């Protein structure tokens, strides 16, 4: 007697179906709605900045990728399901009423179209969503060109590896996915409809199931054969020998390469075996072929290269890898822009032969020696130039140069920006935060080589005088009205900047109805209405609704402060604006303000990068650029593996209207050429750069830090010496902090050795590999006529010239420094500024370091900030002495005279006054609307009384004795004198204050 087929899965009630549909609609709105709103507001924003072509190109490319990959992958899966269903057996026996396969089969049959279409559509949608993110790969393939450089193994142009190969991999990967999904979809379908049975010892397949699965399996293995072919080219970016070098090694080129060809042939045979199963019912042939491929992959693809590496290469690594290291050296220099035509190497002895005052370049260098450290003085700028509590400066200031009265000088510069995080009390009300406090006020600059007055001679005078502060030149609304701007600025209002954008919702709403009163805070006596071209109009209700949803802020809808002419300003960080309009660029970690043609603009360096330049060293971008400054500010490049980098674009962002301009500065970058093909109107040609703007271009810090890491190894020409690491350099650790972070490079204005004129350079000291002695000095020019020219001064391998850490130790352990530091630390915090390394005296190295003091805080509202108190100088004397002389004085001139003798210091830039005066009270910036103003700092009370006088006298006497013993060379006397100093210091500290 026949058996009834089992019932299908229970169906939902009508009410449940309605609720399910509603839930799906709500979920779709929650998922898709924010994306649609974001797309619309982005479309408006790109139109505001004039880069809507970038937005539409990227959007269309993503949509096309979504459609093509989605249709191909979904279509292949749909076709597999269709063929499997149509070739199902006519009669499928049921094992019983509880047969689970029969229940699923019944369910599928009752909803055949749903399953037949929903599964391919879902797979296609998911595949399209994933694939659309690869729009960069597709566009570079379409628009990429030639590098004009052939790889040393296959003789193919580098463009094949950077533009073509990633696209071929992209296509191949999605074909793998499509065929694999189709195989499993067919397998499941045949199983449900009886084409595949698992009962019995070996199971059973219908002819149709066998043919379909064999074709799909054979196609998959055939694609694997194609992948083996492309794997050969990927060997040129092999990581087998990292971190020693990147690229094909001896094992890769002599074992793995041949293994790939062998596996390719075996894969073709294996694919043929599966295709043969179409006609042969015996599945043992494809099974044996598969086993052969798996076994070959293990033995030929893994074991054989391992044997070659262990028994042939390792015992003779230096000789075996020599040719491949040579390839790596050449490719890395090319990829990172450190080829011999860009880098000039000079031998440098490490000790001077000519007095600095007799060398014109040294006179210029000393006169422009930077004493102000932009990494320390942010709080000093804030306390002295903040004006209002809602203004602020970035934690790290910037350095730029200006030609004033025919003389080039470097300046510490910062825009006085709006700091939303500093708003207090009623200032944080939505109306005030977003419609009243909308912009900053002006640019503040200070000459980097001078202060307002020299600190006093004694420790007490140094720490308690109104000296050692920057000499400010302010270009703001007030100075504009008074007509006394040294750096003329026509529009000092800052609507776009780093500090302004340092909050989650960084938008401002400007403008209003026609004829409405100004609302934005400008000065204490005036209000302002924005007149610039920046901002997206929100006068119509649809845009207001879109932005209210974007920021989840109902006030945008209902506020009466928004009128028909209102605009919303957002994306106010200069770096973010650049990366938005040029998503194919990597922005430098630091943007800096400059005055160009009377306007404050932010200059942003931008890089083109590649991940797989054949044989070039691959490295982590964020790891290469991290130093002591970046650790404090968090100003790092993205986590990104690169093997090619160029600073091909300089971008500017107008601080008032947000206008973004991209300028081509490298006309020999094939990557930029490709992107200019993708976005023809995005980047302006190099000849359109105004001369005044070009004069403010700096060689970017992040690129320099990447290149110095490369030069630390890749200055070596001999591959065998490269393999031993003997001639490598290291970036010194920053001696002014307690951690082992790298010392940052420094911008300095130095004398050109040929002309003696000031040259704006970015510099870095380099020490020996795992050593502390100075090994090299790197500098790169930022001057327009010599921009990007590297000079590397190489010291002898047996040099005794101290490196930065040794110099710091010798300076702070000098008896004069140690004794005064003990006195100062009782009521002050000491900070050492940038330790500058300056080549002078035709072969010598001069170290200059400012020392800042900051009075210890005595209360929660006490305002303290750093001031320059002392200048330290270190210089190694020439043979036979080779001794290191240390200068320590309130001024650079005095410190230089201590080291070189009277006269050298006369060329240093003098402070504005000789002695400081006691600090004035009541100079802290006002705080608005209920915030308590900081209390003025009470000066520290100096020690007094006969006990203190006696202790100081004994301390001075012990230091004199220590100096005399040091000069005599009597180690016994030196030890006794040192013990006396320690005893005197302990006695002084024991006096109750």
From Swiss-Prot:
Major subcellular site: membrane
Q: Which UniProt keywords apply?
A: Cell membrane, Membrane, Transmembrane, Transmembrane helix
One Pfam family this sequence matches = UPF0182
Q: Which HAMAP family match?
A: UPF0182
Keyword hit for Transmembrane helix: yes
Enumerate the subcellular locations listed in this protein's record, separating them with semicolons: Cell membrane
Query: What domain of life does the UniProt record list for this protein's source?
Result: Bacteria
Mark out the compositionally biased spans (Low complexity): 908-926
The answer to whether the entry has keyword Ribosomal protein is no
Residues spanning the membrane: 18-38, 63-83, 114-134, 174-194, 211-231, 260-280, 288-308
Q: Which InterPro entries match?
A: UPF0182
Give the UniProt family note: Belongs to the UPF0182 family.
Return the Pro residues bias intervals: 933-942
Q: Which GO terms describe its cellular component?
A: extracellular region; plasma membrane
- What is the membrane topology here? Multi-pass membrane protein
Query: Disulfide bonds, which pairs?
Result: none
**Entry protein name:** UPF0182 protein ROP_64500
Q: Where is this region: Disordered?
A: 904-948
- Fetch the NCBIfam families from UniProt: PRK00068.1, PRK12438.1
